[in-house]
Amino acid sequence: MADEVALALQAAGSPSAAAAMEAASQPADEPLRKRPRRDGPGLGRSPGEPSAAVAPAAAGCEAASAAAPAALWREAAGAAASAEREAPATAVAGDGDNGSGLRREPRAADDFDDDEGEEEDEAAAAAAAAAIGYRDNLLLTDGLLTNGFHSCESDDDDRTSHASSSDWTPRPRIGPYTFVQQHLMIGTDPRTILKDLLPETIPPPELDDMTLWQIVINILSEPPKRKKRKDINTIEDAVKLLQECKKIIVLTGAGVSVSCGIPDFRSRDGIYARLAVDFPDLPDPQAMFDIEYFRKDPRPFFKFAKEIYPGQFQPSLCHKFIALSDKEGKLLRNYTQNIDTLEQVAGIQRILQCHGSFATASCLICKYKVDCEAVRGDIFNQVVPRCPRCPADEPLAIMKPEIVFFGENLPEQFHRAMKYDKDEVDLLIVIGSSLKVRPVALIPSSIPHEVPQILINREPLPHLHFDVELLGDCDVIINELCHRLGGEYAKLCCNPVKLSEITEKPPRPQKELVHLSELPPTPLHISEDSSSPERTVPQDSSVIATLVDQATNNNVNDLEVSESSCVEEKPQEVQTSRNVENINVENPDFKAVGSSTADKNERTSVAETVRKCWPNRLAKEQISKRLEGNQYLFVPPNRYIFHGAEVYSDSEDDVLSSSSCGSNSDSGTCQSPSLEEPLEDESEIEEFYNGLEDDTERPECAGGSGFGADGGDQEVVNEAIATRQELTDVNYPSDKS
């Protein structure tokens, strides 16, 4: 049947079907040949839609909520359609060609893992790919998009590079492809599968079955996540590892450069906020680093470049710590996502800049390459630097710093280095990165799982399992580690005070307790819907009326209740009639506010906003703000909270929660981990597969799902839910965290 479907698609002019059938005809022990280039937009994407920087399909599924906008699903579908492309690969260091003229080496068949039953699964995968119109290299995890860092669409690139994340990421075992193939044979509706995988997500009706099956395959093809080692938990364990390990990989993000004075990018007064005033057509922060937008208007990027150009900043304590590890021969490699070149300033030799840097610039047309000093004058004078060798009337003869833009490739040496380093590393340390951008985000799951892993970051990463979590300002944590390591490391310390450990959460400050005691005690009960818990907030009519008047006069969008409150609330979408029915106000004076119907509706909506925001303001606070100057908090079994940690506490039940919870984490991790023990992930995909196994055990369902024959799938897919990351939170190259 798969052959018939593929032939039908081929007859209809589908090049993907022909590619899939060609893949199915290859010997099973040979790597799949790269597909020929196909021009035009991917499935699920209109011709006018940009193709650069699309998040993975599963991330798109997560971003689409129960009332999922069709645009988000179309973006997820576009990612699914592009998922079979080669993972990023760009010019080798020294070529400086911004993505063309790449070197290609043939890949040997033994580059791939030889799992038992591999040949049978490759044949099944090819048949499934043919049946749904999928192309030939979907089998490998390198097909998953990396938030825009995918292979260029030029023919030259297709001919010249094979380096990709498939060289070093674990390969999924048998399962998802046979599963999809057999469900295709029995005519299963892919929407029923997606409903089980993502129960709160509703795909728009206009998406066809082939696109939906592609999304299913992407979700099920995630590599297995590492599980925490139970024998490594404390900061003492971390210090011992730093003393004993000789081949340490340090993965750094924007957090290591915060203390250097580099301007913030996304804050209210950050770089993007200021650029948006000068360039109102800049749609979002991502566009500044989109290669297509750069070709149309490079001015926003060069205005940004002036603010972080090399030579203006000095390395942080984190940089110096890594440099000393390198000097002592303990550093295997520092993989940095930053573009500020502070690693070189600090003297780190074994450095790999995953997303390029400002160190060099090259022409978009002729690839002429220069040092950063050659274009410094133009950038600081806010003149777009031009290539001296190209004709003056060539509009694209621009000297672009060799930073990896969305829509460009990652350096080929990144993939080659990871292919070697993954088998050599004896300790992984992640500093100042939330690991949201691939393929760098795949590193913790791609090295041997027995290798210890330490996180040093402002917030926890619920989608990954680190052995020791040191949460807070990176320099504060590194300073404490240097004290404990002693010797040359102690000389790096910028703060001579060694911190003391506490194991009980400090009480709320007395000043704040007095403030809370003065709040009106009378409760106001709001039942948002039949399934939501009842909330209790102060009812005093004078307080509420004052806040309502303030919000009405200043516009509800300008009402500042707290920095973190009501982030996900959408009061403009709340039905006024429902608010009136569900708000039980005892004071008649509040009911009489407003004279006209429009005024009542507006004030009712604002009151709803105030009531929703008020509990959040009072309930959540950063635990680190309760710490004294020389303290850090130990939260068993493996979490430490230092100053600057973005870990919050509910005042009522003293439950810790992360600012990232619910936005960039798995569904099982968005509950607040308690003070006693952080919660573990509980995958919804695990429940999905458990249900399928139960079905296959029944006589009437035996063989019906087509999944029971895939033995070994559940172990892999149980850990595959890390696909549900935030679609819209795409970071720029120096903040790929």
From Swiss-Prot:
Compositionally biased residues, Low complexity: 1-28, 46-56, 75-94, 656-676
Description of what induces expression: By calorie restriction which induces endothelial nitric oxide synthase (eNOS) expression. Induced in liver by pyruvate during fasting. Expressed in a circadian manner in the liver with maximal and minimal levels reached at around Zeitgeber time (ZT) 16 and ZT4, respectively. Its deacetylase activity in the liver is also regulated in a circadian manner, with a peak at ZT15. Down-regulated by palmitate; palmitate down-regulation is mediated by the induction of miR-195 that directly targets SIRT1.
Domain of life: Eukaryota
Cofactor: Zn(2+)
EC number assigned by the record: 2.3.1.286, 2.3.1.-
PTM per Swiss-Prot/TrEMBL: Methylated on multiple lysine residues; methylation is enhanced after DNA damage and is dispensable for deacetylase activity toward p53/TP53. Phosphorylated. Phosphorylated by STK4/MST1, resulting in inhibition of SIRT1-mediated p53/TP53 deacetylation. Phosphorylation by MAPK8/JNK1 at Ser-46 and Thr-522 leads to increased nuclear localization and enzymatic activity. Phosphorylation at Thr-522 by DYRK1A and DYRK3 activates deacetylase activity and promotes cell survival. Phosphorylation by mammalian target of rapamycin complex 1 (mTORC1) at Ser-46 inhibits deacetylation activity. Phosphorylated by CaMK2, leading to increased p53/TP53 and NF-kappa-B p65/RELA deacetylation activity.
Effect of residue 390 to S: Impairs S-nitrosylation. Abolishes S-nitrosylation
S-nitrosocysteine PTM sites in chain numbering: 387, 390
PANTHER family in UniProt: NAD-DEPENDENT PROTEIN DEACETYLASE SIRTUIN-1, NAD-DEPENDENT PROTEIN DEACYLASE SIRTUIN-5, MITOCHONDRIAL-RELATED
Annotated protein name in UniProt: NAD-dependent protein deacetylase sirtuin-1
The encoding gene: Sirt1
